[in-house]
Each structure stands twice: as structure tokens, then as C-alpha cells.
């Protein structure tokens, strides 16, 4: 390999440091490297042969002298594999003389040239991509956005006689998200959220109110006064389970994906939202509490209205049986047997245990019930999720130590707790 020829297949660079107790020159160092490693390793790793066949490159030496001592760096390009390169790097440390002087060589590192090249490729690709974006003409960007918008518009559906803008899943989803306008539906559709419906104005159509009573409903309103007005109207005629808002001063149609996901993740039960934000007038609050409690207890709606009139700022919990009858006492006595066990049981109509369950698997166990079951009793907390699946499976009683965040209780299900 000629002196001017560069090694083009370099995989690694061996970096070594040399210290000599005297003044030495570059040829002295190169000679010591070849001479003192000769015969040390097998013929396959002989430096002269490796250089002749192009498997190592030209040895580079940068050295300088000061105060009668010399120090510098040795760099050897290698196209050998990792193991062979490591052996070669270690062999340099056996050199103890350079020219007439005692010397010491220490391998500092073995650099992976390909990793450096990959990093260069990534950085350069970023620059090229950035330039592509910046150089794209406004007309091209508008054209791309028009195509994307057309695709979203094609997916948009309609709901009810009012032909309200809605996502394609509005007719099949068990949960819906109510927003203000068509632009909000389009924006959420862009992020893959398809169970939305728009009220199209401050006056909420009755069809939305009726739909909200059949589905688990989340109101997603703008973070301004308009959002509050729509929320008030929706609470007057509908049944809202959860509420969330865009950040203050922002509209749902302008939110980025992360903002949308955070807002939906942080939704809270309606009663808790009203108590925290205090955005309803007193009469509105009365109507809202009456509606939430009267939904499942219409015969006693007037009494419930009076009971909750002074509790506007307290979280509304599902009312459980206030008078402890014999059945309730029996259930509580049975529950005490499971206290601290982390277990529960599925009972038939005669209150005979048909299956013992682990609390951590309680949801799946109820979901997979195939035989007739009457009661589920367990050492844990009753959640809205358990209420929903128990109702679906025809369970008549859920018995546990307490309940949490239950906003919708089916008429066919009785909840008994120690609270």
C-alpha cells in the first residue's frame, strides 16, 4: 500500500499515548512498534503483513520533546474485527524502549469509526430535512394541508335530526365527547378521536341531551366564557358524567395533540368539577344536583333537590340505602369475613359461594361470569368500572368496604358498603 494511499475500509482507530525518557523522533516510534511486536503475535496479526495487505493503515505519530523528555500520540487505523483490533491495541503496551530511550505506551481508547459516521449521517440528515421544510413553498404547504383537511372532512359524520357534526364512531361508541363546533370535531378527528359530537352553538339541541342519558358522556369545552355557557346549557338538558376544559383562553379547535390528550386524561366527575370551579349560579346548581340524583330516583326527585341545595360545593356521591335492613346487615356481616384477605366471592341467589376470587382480578372475574350470579362481595373498593361490568352481567348486589367516584348507578344494581 503506497504512502499516499488512504485506507478506505477503516473500522476502528487505535489511540495510544507514548512517554519516553529522552528525545525520540517519529521514525524511532514507528520502528519500535514494528520491531518489538514482531513475533509476539501469530503470523495473522503481524503488523508488517497486515499493513501490506491493507488490513491496517499507515501508523500516525504526533510527538514533541520538552525538557529532555518526549511524549505524544500514536494512531493506528484498523479494518480488523473487534477482537483482533483489541489484541493489536493491547500488544502496543508491551513496548518498553524507543530508540535508545526507555519508553511506555498506553492504549487510551479504540474508536469505532462507523459509529462516528452514523452520527454524522444523522446530523446531516436533520440539516437536510430542515432545509427541505424551510424551502417548501407556501403554496405546497397549503396544498398538503388541503388534502389532509379533505381526508378529515370525508371521515366526519352527522348525528340526529339536527345533522350535528360528529365523529364516525358516534353511533357505536359507549362513551361520547361533546364539543362546541364542527372545527372541534375535526381537530379531535385529526388525533384519532372519533366518538365526538358538536352542539353547534350555545343552544344545545335536545338530541344531545337524550344521547347523553344513554352514553357515558364527557363535556370538552373551550377555556373561555363561551365554554362555561355551553356547559351550563348542557347540564340543564343532558346528563354529563365527566367534564374537562381546554387551557384557559384556548379553544378546543386550536389544541395540539398533547394538550388534547392531557385534557381528556384529566377529566373529572361532574359534581367534583362544579364544586372545584364554582361556575354555576345557585339555581343552575340546584337543577344540576336534582338532575344527577333524580336520574335514578325520579320518584323522590323533590326530596333529593332539597337535600342537595346547600351542598353545591361538596362532591356528590351516589346515595346508598340509608336504612339498614336485614339484608344489608347480613351482607355487612359476610363482608367482615373477608376483611384484610384481599379476596372476595361470587354468590348465587341463595347466597351460596359459587366462586372465590382475588381482588386484584375482580374485574376480569366479573366480566367472565357465565353462570347466574346474584352478589359479588370482596375486600376492596367499588369503582364505576366495576359497577358498569356488574350491571352488564346482571349482578344484583356489589358489596365492599367503600365506593369511589361512582357517578352513574344502574337501577338494577344495589351497592352496599361499610361507609
From Swiss-Prot:
A single BP term in Gene Ontology: DNA replication, synthesis of primer
Annotated source species: Methanobrevibacter smithii (strain ATCC 35061 / DSM 861 / OCM 144 / PS)
Gene name for this UniProt entry: dnaG
Disordered: region residues: 277-314
UniProt keyword terms in alphabetical order: DNA replication, DNA-directed RNA polymerase, Exosome, Magnesium, Metal-binding, Nucleotidyltransferase, Primosome, Transcription, Transferase
List of residues binding Mg(2+) 1: 180, 222
Known catalytic reactions: ssDNA + n NTP = ssDNA/pppN(pN)n-1 hybrid + (n-1) diphosphate
Name this polypeptide is given: DNA primase DnaG
Database matches in CDD domains: TOPRIM_primases
Domain Toprim: from-to ranges: 174-260
Subunit structure: Forms a ternary complex with MCM helicase and DNA. Component of the archaeal exosome complex.
Biased composition (Basic residues): 288-305
